Structure formats: C-alpha cells, structure tokens
C-alpha cells in the first residue's frame, strides 16, 4: 500500500479548479474562433468566397423583365495544420506537501504565451496576424514601408508622420472593407514610446490624431512584449518579426481564428503502483486568416538615426 505524506490530498477536479488562467489570450479578440479536432485530418482545408465586386449590378425589376443580372465569384482554398503540444507533470506520493496547482498554473501560463506567439507571428505550417506573404491571401494587405521616422525628431513630428500612415490604413479599409471598427496592434520599443509618451488630454496625441483620420471607431492595442521574446518565438517555432516596429490593423468581423486546443490542463490521474499522481497540460496549433478584403492590414515602421 502506498504511503502519502502530503497533508491534504486534493481531488483532481478540485485541483484543476484551482488552476489560475492568469494570462489573457489575444486570439478571442482577433477574430471568430473555430475549434478543430486534431484527429480529423493532417490538414484541414476550407474555402472563402472571392466576390467580383464589379459584377454587383442589380437589375431593375418590373413585370416585363426577362433577365436578372448575376454576380461573379470565385473561391480561394486555404489550409490549417492541426496539431497538439503538451506537457506532463508528476508528483510523487512520497513528496511533502507541494503547490501542485501553482506549478500547473505556471505551466499553463507558459503555454498561453506561446499560443499568443503563434497567433501573432504564425509558424511554418500556419499563418499568424503578421505575415509578409500577402500574395498567398488576397484579403491580407501589406503596405509599403515608405515613411521613415527620425529617431531624434520631436514627439509632435513623429505623431505627424504616423498620421500619414494612419491615412494609408484608413484608405485601405475605406476602399476595400466596410468594417464597423478596427483594432490596431502595435509593437516595437520606439513606436511604443510614442504611443505611451503622450497626454491623452491634448490634441497632439495618437488618439486625437486617430479621431481626425478614422471614420470608424479604432482601438490601439500593444502586442504583448512577452510573447515576442526570442525565447517564446523559438519554443513555439514561430516566424520572426518583419521589422523592429510596426502596426497591424485588424477588422475582427473579417478574420477567422482556427485552433485545436486552448492552453489548459486536460487530464490527470494516479499511479498507485509507482506512487505518483500525473497531470497533462495541452495546447495546440492556431491560424489567423482574413476572409474579406482588408481583413488585416500590415504597416511596418522604420526609425532612422
């Protein structure tokens, strides 16, 4: 019979209920979530409708009409590679009282950061929010980096330069998309300093400039710096950032997020013969795909000395 020196034995359900999901995932904000079973297929394919907008010419309908105009539409096929990533944890029955739920919470947090890394950057198998290969998806726009911000310029001058970039982004959404609102995610130390270094009560702030430029509500969201560290990029086998600073504008209504498993503890049990409890934590692949024109618009930003 096994000996257990832990003062308080926790039932599995009780233990898992104590796990803290302390890292808020980015994916639910980015687009509509669609879960897949990893057992379904090696690759899940799906199609989107590419409407020829020039063919949308409605006919005037009257009793003598003999023909109604038809629209033209093609399809685009995209793929999602489903796979699981996992961690296991064992606790010996001979071990003194340990904070098992704390250990599992910390592990789930690490998996959550890596899930964000994949959501943002993508991998060799699946696309993320930031992709420089726009030719593979006609709904993903990569704007040319034709504006260089002087690193030594005043904050006002930098904001004025950013206004030109905002105008480009606004033009993309205005001419290609009917978004009701967009989120602009930004990254990079120099760009973050501009966003964070302003008093929101003045007219020269980023928010004030955005209100002047955008005709729809816009929110600015800093990409989690933790998820962009090389440690997590390497662990998640994610793609590299295309630039040190940049912005990616997203219309959540025009984006789908395919995934297999959100980071969480998924199973647990006890091996009485070997006298240990075991716990499994799992996460899985994720893909971010714009499904309408200008669903995602990327704009990198260059700072010169």
Where are these regions (language model features)?
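Assembly/oligomerization interface modules of large self-assembling protein complexes
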Residues: 14-87
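A contiguous, surface-oriented mixed alpha/beta subdomain in the mid-to-C-terminal portion of proteins
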Residues: 136, 140-225
């Amino acid at each position: 019979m096994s000996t257990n020196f832990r003062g308080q034995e926790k039932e599995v359900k009780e233990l898992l209920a104590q796990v803290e999901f302390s890292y808020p995932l980015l994916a639910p904000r980015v687009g509509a979530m669609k879960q897949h079973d990893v057992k379904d297929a090696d690759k899940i394919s799906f199609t989107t409708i590419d409407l020829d907008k020039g063919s949308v010419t409605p006919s005037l309908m009257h009793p003598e009409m003999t023909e109604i105009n038809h629209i033209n539409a093609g399809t685009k096929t995209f793929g999602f590679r489903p796979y699981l990533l996992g961690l296991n944890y064992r606790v010996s029955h001979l071990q003194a009282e340990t904070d098992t739920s704390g250990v599992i919470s910390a592990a789930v947090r690490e998996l959550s950061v890596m899930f964000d890394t994949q959501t943002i950057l993508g991998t060799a198998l699946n696309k993320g929010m930031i992709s420089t290969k726009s030719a593979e998806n006609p709904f993903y726009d990569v704007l040319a980096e034709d504006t260089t911000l002087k690193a030594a310029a005043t904050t006002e001058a930098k904001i004025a330069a950013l206004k030109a970039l905002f105008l480009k982004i606004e033009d993309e959404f205005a001419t290609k998309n009917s978004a009701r609102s967009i989120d602009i995610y930004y990254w990079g130390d120099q760009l973050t300093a501009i966003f964070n270094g302003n008093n929101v009560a003045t007219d020269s702030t980023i928010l004030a400039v955005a209100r002047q430029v955008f005709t729809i509500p816009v929110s600015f969201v800093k990409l989690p710096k933790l998820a962009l560290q090389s440690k997590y990029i390497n662990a998640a086998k994610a793609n590299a950032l295309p630039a040190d600073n940049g912005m990616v504008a997203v219309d959540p209504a025009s984006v789908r997020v395919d995934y297999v498993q959100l980071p969480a503890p998924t199973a647990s049990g006890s091996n009485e013969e070997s006298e240990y409890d075991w716990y499994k934590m799992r996460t899985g692949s994720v893909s971010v795909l714009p499904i309408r024109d200008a669903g995602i618009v990327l704009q990198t930003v260059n700072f010169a000395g």
